[in-house]
Amino acid sequence: MAANMYRVGDYVYFENSSSNPYLIRRIEELNKTASGNVEAKVVCFYRRRDISNTLIMLADKHAKETEEESETPVEADLTEKQKHQLKHRELFLSRQYESLPATHIRGKCSVALLNETESVLSYLDKEDTFFYSLVYDPSVKTLLADKGEIRVGPKYQADIPDMLPEDSDEREQSKLEVKVWDPNSPLTDRQIDQFLVVARAVGTFARALDCSSSVRQPSLHMSAAAASRDITLFHAMDTLYRHGYDLSSAISVLVPLGGPVLCRDEMEEWSASEACLFEEALEKYGKDFNDIRQDFLPWKSLTSIIEYYYMWKTTDRYVQQKRLKAAEAESKLKQVYIPTYKPNPNQISSSNGKAGTVNGAVGTQFQPQSALLGRACESCYATQSHQWYSWGPPNMQCRLCATCWLYWKKYGGLKMPTQSDEEKSPSPTAEDPRARSHMSRQALQGMPVRNTGSPKSAVKTRQAFFLRTTYFTKIARQVCKSTLRLRQAARRPFVAINYAAIRAEYADRHAELSGSPLKSRSTRKPLSCIIGYLEIHPAKKPNVIRSPPSLQTPATKRMLAAPNHTSLSILGKRNYSHHNGLDGPERWLSR
């Protein structure tokens, strides 16, 4: 019961395909839809097989630099098998959220930030344990470090010079700091409080006279509350200090000839629409003020946004939203029970419904039973297992035992490293649009490409097509030779041709040539007339000057090629030389 109970904050496996590895996600919320189903709002984690080849190289470079800086080498004592399996435990965190049906959850796992003080073998020794150190942004395809680094060592630390003898400080102390209040003033606390009450009253009266403030603060109570904020009190205390704590002169400054002084803070400077935008941005980005300013409030300064945030937290609106969020969190689902589902569709079973014990002793829904004889596990090469699973495209006839199949689903790779994995560099992923068209189906799924020798496994030929040139295009080639310049264009295939200039020149030349008559094509005489003319006028044979017999050189004679008795290929029972237009070895003999 507890194994199938999933709560908010758990790291879980999600199955989006019966043949692909599990997705690794962290549950953020559990929401119940209108239809009664449960959806999970999750944070996405990506495997190495999910990102591009370039980013994998950057991640390996970052890991190598981290290993060089650390005192204990990370992969010094690891075998090739352990290094291969360690790559399957590495994940990449993302800030991307998605909603998935809770019924697709297939188990729990554990994901932690890479601990540099802990041995990497601890991740291999624990089941369903993963680690991450970099953050992947799927929108811009970049990798970033998830935590800041404290760089320790002579490379990053400053050289501390020797202590110098004490000298007199020649700096002007008046420029270093400014005194704004004197606690030893001649006024008592009661007199200062009375002056602050006068400053609040002046601020309330100033808001009553200001038209824009009257719109924002329609009632006297709200105007008095706005005048009682810190900016009014700070201005009053600063005015009192600047006038030597003389109450009469300070009050005269608060109420000059032009009218009372009005002091506003960020709460009053912001409009209602700007406040709504700020709350929307805060709901989306949290306290990431740089993103809030960039996407929602670019006309506000960062200082203004931060100041408004801490003032906004003191308002009743913030308290109300906090209570609403607490009530929503209380009403949301805290956990969900997902029962064990039916067997995987890739499971191979015999005709009587019992699981096979030997790979090849049972049949599948894809291949006949005779085609599976002698097939072993593609990962560990075992020939016996209590259950077998079809792996890869059906025409590949690949199978995995129960242990390797579970490893493939959880960790996204084969348990045992293959020779091709050791020799080749990481292949491009399906996310790269330039490489996707050149990858086969099994390569897109991260499976090895195997050549079985069967014509079924060959790549299908694409549908043939041809490009038909229009009549006007053929005319434009002749009319616009100076602009088109076909020879230069052929030598530069990646430089675009200016079709607009060609079209304009063709229109001008076509108007010029439309008035001139076209040259009529000469009609060809029939063959009977040509034969009659040749009979009447036979061709004269040229006089050939023959040399004496002693000066004649032996004429060479080309002999037929000797038959090539090499082995016949499948291509029409002819060898490679015949299919490429070659006659084999030739011998030249003199007559």
Swiss-Prot record:
Signal peptide stretch: none
Keywords in alphabetical order: Cytoplasm, DNA-binding, Metal-binding, Nucleus, Phosphoprotein, Zinc, Zinc-finger
Any Gene Ontology biological process: G2/M transition of mitotic cell cycle
Positions of post-translational Phosphothreonine modification: T452
Any one Gene Ontology cellular component term annotated for this protein: nucleoplasm
Record-annotated SANT domain positions: 265-317
One term of GO molecular function: protein-containing complex binding
Modified residues (Phosphoserine): S425, S427, S516
Biased composition (Basic and acidic residues): 421-435
ZnF (GATA-type) intervals: 377-404
Domain BAH: 1-147
CDD domains: BAH_MTA, SANT_MTA3_like, ZnF_GATA
Chain ranges of the ELM2 domain: 148-258
S-S bonds: none
Cellular localisation: Nucleus; Cytoplasm
Region (Disordered): 417-456
Domain of life from the UniProt record: Eukaryota
Expression sites (tissue/organ): Expressed in heart, brain, spleen, lung, liver and kidney.
Oligomeric form and interacting partners: Component of the nucleosome remodeling and deacetylase (NuRD) repressor complex, composed of core proteins MTA1, MTA2, MTA3, RBBP4, RBBP7, HDAC1, HDAC2, MBD2, MBD3, and peripherally associated proteins CDK2AP1, CDK2AP2, GATAD2A, GATAD2B, CHD3, CHD4 and CHD5. The exact stoichiometry of the NuRD complex is unknown, and some subunits such as MBD2 and MBD3, GATAD2A and GATAD2B, and CHD3, CHD4 and CHD5 define mutually exclusive NuRD complexes. Interacts with BCL6. Interacts with NACC2. Interacts with PWWP2B.
Functional note: Acts as a component of the histone deacetylase NuRD complex which participates in the remodeling of chromatin. Plays a role in maintenance of the normal epithelial architecture through the repression of SNAI1 transcription in a histone deacetylase-dependent manner, and thus the regulation of E-cadherin levels. Contributes to transcriptional repression by BCL6.
Family statement: Belongs to the metastasis-associated protein family.
Protein name: Metastasis-associated protein MTA3
UniProt organism field: Mus musculus
